[in-house]
Amino acid sequence: MRKRIWVGLPLALVFGGIFAFHTVFHIPEQPEMTTISDGSFNQQLHCYESSTRASIDQEGRLNLLVWNIYKQNRANWQSVLTQMSAGAQLILLQEASLEDGLKRWIASGGWSGEQVNAFKAFDKAAGVLTLGWRKPRLACGYTQLEPWIRLPKSGLYSEYPLSDGQMLIVVNLHAVNFTWGVQEYQQQVNDLIAALKEHPGPAIVAGDFNTWSEKRLQAVTERLENAGLIEVVFSPDQRTRFITGLPLDHVFYKGLEVQKAEAPQTDASDHNPLLVSFTLPTDK
């Protein structure tokens, strides 16, 4: 009898853990996207298209905020987000939890956007969120499963019209983290930047790349450089760094001109935000 109890106990713990995981987390079978427009939040599947012609830049200027917002777990996230996004036309958030406080903030600012539902925890969606003062022409969500913890990371591909007639590609990425090698990491990056090599116009690829090792940093840098993108240099550079000293968050671009780039410090998240001011090229 005692042997049966000891054999059954580990099995009970395993099945109990599986049950608890599926009770807390809901993982979509395919990427799901929530579209945001005029204060309304609507569920879409994978891709969204619009007929908008409104340009995302403002008279040739494009101010960008990139920030892993840590699921809004810090009490001062809202005031800092308001401060950091002042004057921005484009916001790329990672680990955004689409709860009531963030929904109200988005609606009050008149933002349009899309969130990729990587997973839901206690029925609240979390994933990358791209917000713009104008709607995108196209937006598609992507997910890549973390091989160890079995929770996906998400990415969002968007296309925005520009005032000079070109189309801007924007990729908002939260890269997989818990991998032994770089295979899953490379696959996620490859899926999202596949269209960049064929795109002759401007592009921005930004987010939390989880580049905590030299192999990861090299993998993403080589692929983006091969697609013609350049990494933004920040000053001051207070980007969040791993114990290896490597920064986790990056902005890459092509077909635009950088006027200012800074990564200030804040305690409103476990990541510091990235602020970049672009202009459209004058010698197109």
From Swiss-Prot:
Transmembrane region(s): none
Cellular component terms (Gene Ontology): cytoplasm
Pfam families for this protein: Exo_endo_phos
Lineage: superkingdom: Bacteria
Alphabetic keyword roster: Cytoplasm
GO molecular function annotations of the record: catalytic activity
Subcellular location: Cytoplasm
UniProt-listed HAMAP family: UPF0294
Family: Belongs to the UPF0294 family.
Name this polypeptide is given: UPF0294 protein VV2535
